[in-house]
Amino acid sequence: MIETAVKTLKEIAAAIPDTSPGMERQMLIGDLVAKQSPAERTALRKLMDSYLLRMSNVNASDIDMGGYGSGGNIWYRIFGDKKPQVDLGKFTMDEFNVLIQSIMIERQRLFLYENRNMVSSTRWCARTRALTCMPT
């Protein structure tokens, strides 16, 4: 399942032309995400859920993905010590952007495009095993 989701993520990101800059690039990513099949969206959501479940299992207080300093890794802060999780693989900025936008609803993507950022409160609900991201 994870391998399939990562493959889907890489295929979608590969469709993003190098010539698209800044917010135009984010909007193009949003268009690609909107065209995903329900199966692809489900696979990407489960991939993100796996990262969040791991976060919970290792008692991490936060997760960091996609910053320029990330080196393409997903980072967890565990008891105040922030480290890359190299065993989760390497991702490009576009791959992180596709993954993050794939869990956002359309209104959140519109908020991102209009405000050029997405300050969010993200909660992992153990009861429903779902990620909730809401603009703040």
Give the positions of each predicted feature.
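Intrinsic-disorder signal
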Residues: 2-11
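N-terminal "pre-motor" subdomain/linker immediately upstream of P-loop NTPase catalytic cores
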Residues: 3, 17-136
